[in-house]
C-alpha cells in the first residue's frame, strides 16, 4: 500500500467480522474444532472466491462461518482483523456481527458476543483502536426472528451501539423490518441498513423513512434517483461504500465504472470500506489503493474520504 495512503487516519464503518475470516484462519479453526471442510487446502478455497452475485458469495460466507464455535474462535477472528487495521492506520472501527448466523447453528448468543467484545476491548487497550459494535439482522429471515435476536441481545446492551440489516437484498425490502428497528431505536440504539447495493433506490428511501437509519451501507444506486441524491447531499447522510466488494459481486463490471468519486465531488458524504475483505481481495487500504490506481483518486480526495469516515462515526 502507498505510504501516503497508509499515513491517513481512517475509520472503517462497513465490515462484517465473519467476512474477515481469512482462509488460513478458517482452516486453523476447522482443525481446532475437528470440522471437515469441503476444500482440500487454502488454495482450493481461495479459488472458490469467484462470485457472479451477492447470493453466490453469501452461500460460501455462511459455510465458512460454520467453523466459528467457541468464544476463543470469535476472539481470534476479531483480533486478526484488528491487527490488519493497525497496520493500515485504521483508528476506529464499527464492525457488524450476525448473531443469527451462529445462534441458528446452536451457538449461544453470549459466546459470540463475549469473544468479539473482549477482542475489541483488547484492541482499544493494546492497539489504540476505538470501536462501536453493530448487531446486524439477516433480512432473508422473518422479522420475528430479528425480534428474538434483539431480545437475546438486550442483557448485553452496553456491548453494542446499534443495529443493522444485511444479507440478500433483492426481494427483502427494508420495510419488512420497520417494527424491529422502531423497537431498537426505542432502546436508544443507532440504526443503519444495507440498501442500494443490488436493490433499487426505493430501498434507500425505505431505509431512511421507515427504518430511520443514520447511515446507508452501500447506497451506490442512489445515483439513479436525482431527488434521492439531493436529499443525501442536503442531509449529509453518510454512505459506507465498499469498492472492491462492488466489483467482486458484479455491482459494477470494473473499478473504472465505480461512482464513488463522482458522488464525492457532488458533495455526498461517501466513505471507503472493505465489507468482507477475506472474500473480496482487500482491506480498507487496498480499497483506497484501488481507487487511486483505477479512478485516479488524488491525495486531496483520499483525505476527504478518510475524514468523512471519521466524521460519520456513531461511537
From Swiss-Prot:
GO terms for biological process: adenine catabolic process; hypoxanthine salvage; nucleotide metabolic process. Its EC number is 3.5.4.2. Binds 1 zinc ion per subunit. It catalyses: adenine + H2O + H(+) = hypoxanthine + NH4(+). GO terms for cellular component: cytosol. The record marks 218 as: Important for catalytic activity. Zn(2+) binds at residues 14, 16, 194, 275. Its cofactor is Zn(2+). The active site is at 197 (proton donor). One of its GO terms (molecular function) is zinc ion binding. It is an enzyme of class 3 (hydrolase). Substrate binds at residue 276. HAMAP family: Adenine_deaminase. Belongs to the metallo-dependent hydrolases superfamily. Adenosine and AMP deaminases family. Adenine deaminase type 2 subfamily. Catalyzes the hydrolytic deamination of adenine to hypoxanthine. Plays an important role in the purine salvage pathway and in nitrogen catabolism. This is Adenine deaminase. It comes from Ectopseudomonas mendocina (strain ymp).
Amino acid at each position: 500500500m502507498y505510504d501516503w495512503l497508509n499515513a491517513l487516519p481512517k475509520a472503517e464503518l462497513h465490515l462484517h467480522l465473519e467476512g474477515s475470516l481469512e482462509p488460513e484462519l478458517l482452516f486453523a479453526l476447522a482443525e481446532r474444532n475437528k470440522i471437515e471442510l469441503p476444500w482440500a487446502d487454502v488454495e482450493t478455497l481461495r479459488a472458490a472466491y469467484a462470485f457472479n452475485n451477492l447470493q453466490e458469495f453469501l452461500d460460501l460466507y455462511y459455510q465458512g462461518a460454520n467453523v466459528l464455535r467457541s468464544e476463543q474462535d470469535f476472539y481470534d477472528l476479531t483480533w486478526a482483523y484488528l491487527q490488519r487495521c493497525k497496520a493500515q492506520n485504521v483508528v476506529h472501527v464499527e464492525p457488524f456481527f450476525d448473531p443469527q448466523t451462529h445462534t441458528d447453528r446452536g451457538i449461544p448468543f453470549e459466546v459470540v458476543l463475549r469473544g468479539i467484545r473482549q477482542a475489541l476491548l483488547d484492541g482499544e487497550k493494546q492497539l489504540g483502536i476505538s470501536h462501536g459494535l453493530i448487531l446486524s439482522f439477516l433480512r432473508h429471515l422473518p422479522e420475528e426472528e430479528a425480534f428474538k435476536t434483539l431480545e437475546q441481545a438486550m442483557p448485553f446492551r452496553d456491548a453494542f451501539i446499534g443495529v443493522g440489516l444485511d444479507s440478500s437484498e433483492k426481494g427483502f425490502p427494508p420495510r419488512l423490518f420497520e417494527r424491529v428497528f422502531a423497537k431498537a431505536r426505542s432502546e436508544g440504539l443507532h440504526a443503519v441498513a444495507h440498501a442500494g447495493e443490488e436493490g433499487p433506490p426505493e430501498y434507500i428511501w425505505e431505509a431512511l423513512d421507515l427504518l430511520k437509519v443514520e447511515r446507508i451501507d452501500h447506497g451506490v444506486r442512489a445515483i439513479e434517483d436525482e431527488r434521492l441524491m439531493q436529499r443525501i447531499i442536503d442531509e449529509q447522510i453518510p454512505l459506507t461504500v465498499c469498492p472492491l466488494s462492488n466489483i467482486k459481486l458484479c455491482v459494477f463490471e470494473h473499478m473504472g465504472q465505480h461512482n464513488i468519486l463522482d458522488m464525492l465531488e457532488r458533495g455526498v458524504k461517501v466513505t471507503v470500506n472493505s465489507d468482507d475483505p477475506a472474500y473480496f481481495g482487500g482491506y480498507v487500504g487496498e480499497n483506497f489503493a484501488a481507487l487511486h490506481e483505477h479512478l485516479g483518486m488524488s491525495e486531496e480526495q483520499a483525505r476527504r474520504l478518510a475524514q468523512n469516515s471519521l466524521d460519520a462515526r456513531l461511537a
